[in-house]
Amino acid sequence: MESIPNQLPAGRDSSCSPNSKDLQSYSGPPLKPNQVSETSLYGIPIVSLVIDGQERLCLAQISNTLLKNYSYNEIHNRRVALGITCVQCTPVQLEILRRAGAMPISSRRCGMITKREAERLCKSFLGAHSPPKLPENFAFDVSHECAWGSRGNFIPARYNSSRAKCIKCSFCNMYFSPNKFIFHSHRTPESKYTQPDAANFNSWRRHLKLSDKNSSDDVIHAWEDVKAMFNGGSRKRTLPIGRSESSPSQPPRGQTQGEPSDVPHKTLRCEDDRVNVTMPSSIRSYPVIPVPSKSFGMLQKIPPPLFPHPYGFPAFGLCQKKDDGEVMGEPNKTNLSGVFWPSPKDSAYTSFPMFWPTTGSLAMPTYHHAQPKPPSDVLCARHNELDVSEQSDRSTSTPKDSLLDNERCSSTQSTRNEEDKSGDESRSIEGIPPTSRKISYISAFRPVVKDVESIAKLYGNRGPYSGPRSGYMSPDFLSESSSYRSVSPDVDSVDDPDVDVESHKAHEDEECLQLSVDDRRSPHSLTLAQSEGVKGQDQENTQMHTLNDLHSTNSSETRPSDMESHGNKHTTRFEVYARERDEHVHQMSTSYFGSATTYQRETSVKDVHEEEPSSTVEEMEPKNHQDENNISEERLKEPNDVCADEEAICKDTGNRGSLIEKNIESMAKEELQKQLVEQVELRKKLEREFQNLKDSFQDQMKRELSYREEMVQQLQIVREAHDALHHFSCKMLTPRHCTGTCTFKPPLLPP
């Protein structure tokens, strides 16, 4: 009983209807109740028991022998769909089946089906689903009793799919598919309404019956065969891999006992059968897209197939290995190394772009598993699988740049989840050393402007912009920094050298950036140098120099010969700080010296307010408020009046006071006067804006106060109305108990 195929009878055609020999048990002498016998079903002996004058077979024994390669759920669903009713055993009958060896000792219940039903059930799983041999113009006279009921002609010649309109209604002459016909009814004078039991689209086989109750056995069997045709999806549509091609409508006749039958197998239930089964060697050399089948459950339950899969493709990417003699091992080593999850070591096929078409035969990157690998392996794998066109476009860049661009490649690699991580997290996963990233923290948002000059002007104070990469002119790539890189900018910007690969202007940009950052960081030392150089001037001239000393650095950048002689002295001593620390010192100096550095920032990025929509009114309000508070502080504060933080900054940068002093002296008086006028105009403009904000805020406060007063009045009216209504209801309903002064007045809302 272990090997099913070898015990099939030699001349038995599994697709034909049972002949009279198989039905001889029905035509014999009358059967005794609970009579035990043994019946051969597909060559397997099955215990049968006489119940209610009918010989019934043990369904559990059939499931454990003939259908042992199918799950209990599959067998149950197919039995229900075929309309096979299961009769439960009594405890006495169950004990008889136990002693006959059909049921194990631990069994609690057993279902019994007739031999004809058992043959139909096994045939739906094991037999070839060829249409029954019927006359050419034959039609079944069928009817159903769902709702008001209906009657029609089922034409088998039209029944070529599960949704084929093969039933012609006898009342309206319209054609319906079987699953729709049971919902189609006509009310006749003698019909009565019947609420159908479990009438859904898949239960038509239960509700659709032959109109003639006394039909011949041939018609009944043909009707059963027709009902079993497209039931639950036939697994005989494509032949198994490695088998010789023959038409499915002509099954092989006269198989010898040594030949394996073409019995398709599906989900295994017995774990013992999975060991020592070799796979066939005829594996196709191209991958196919797996189409999931309805009857497959979760992926964890799918083991390696026992026999060649009946589909032309393995389901859910269960690609078989290329090794011919390799044994599919233990059940806990089930391999899902297929199309969806290819791992580098055990995938049978190479990486192949099956979901997104490519031009020509370009190799595309696969989905890499997150396996622990040394960084060099990851780099080599990434470089080998780069697109050919990308490599030709970026041949001028360094390997570091091509690696970074590979991380930002197209949607086939689905790196959006990597961008959601921080920079350190994604770097540690991929094994890339932290020094392989460029510093190009421009913005977390994509700039709208497309030309390079306006971007450089827009982000002029934030660092050198290297321009967009050649070959990528879309706005998506204009901003070099991804969203996860601008989360923590000072991770990379402390140690990495700021190298611009394309323009090779790193040295000049670094010196200019150092001077501008250092000068912005030390406004108090500049004021000390001024006070030593221009002691004879009055307080107003001191304010003028304080306002304009920072612009001397911006104007002196156009004279690099004058700057580089002084800049080289201090290049080795000062490094470019991260932008957060720069802005922190910038805010500290603003609080001590009014709005001098604020004005410097406003004039150098004049276009920011027009081009950047992100500078909102809420951001300007505290800055303007700080400016207004510091108007009087400028005229009252002496240059020597400093705090401890300022002295620490002064110690770092005090020796550069002479440099700025020379620059200020070299400037013409007209330039200073011109810049002072600009600063005064800016101050007036900011004061006007702040006054407008203040007025609008006061108006809003007044509106809110009036709204609150109105709400208080409304609540008072509601409270009074509630009290009056309650008093009136007390008076109307209980006139003898309420004397007009009702004490029960629960407040509707708190006062």
Curated annotation (Swiss-Prot):
Comp. bias regions, Low complexity: 479-491
Gene3D superfamilies xrefs: SAND domain-like, Ski
What are the boundaries of the region Disordered? 1-30, 234-267, 386-434, 459-569, 600-635
Q: Which InterPro entries match?
A: c-SKI_SMAD4-bd_dom (IPR014890), DNA-bd_dom_put_sf (IPR009061), SAND-like_dom_sf (IPR010919), SKI/SNO/DAC (IPR003380), Ski_DNA-bd_sf (IPR037000), Tscrpt_reg_SKI_SnoN (IPR023216)
According to UniProt, the name of this protein is SKI family transcriptional corepressor 1 homolog-B
Q: What does the sequence similarity comment in the record state about its family?
A: Belongs to the SKI family.
Q: Give a GO biological-process term.
A: negative regulation of BMP signaling pathway
Which Pfam families does the record associate with it? c-SKI_SMAD_bind, Ski_Sno_DHD
Principal location: nucleus
Instruction: List, alphabetically, the GO terms of the cellular component aspect.
Output: cytoplasm; nucleus; transcription regulator complex
Please give one Gene Ontology molecular function term for this protein: DNA-binding transcription factor activity, RNA polymerase II-specific
**Protein function:** May inhibit BMP signaling.
What lineage is on file?
A: Eukaryota, Metazoa, Chordata, Craniata, Vertebrata
Species of the source: Danio rerio
Where does this protein have compositionally biased stretches of type Polar residues?
14-27, 244-259, 539-558
Subcellular location field: Nucleus
Q: Where is the composition biased (Basic and acidic residues)?
A: 416-428, 559-569, 603-612, 620-635
The alphabetized UniProt keywords are: Coiled coil, Nucleus, Repressor, Transcription, Transcription regulation
What SUPFAM superfamilies does its record include?
Putative DNA-binding domain, SAND domain-like
Where along the sequence do coiled-coil regions lie? 666-704
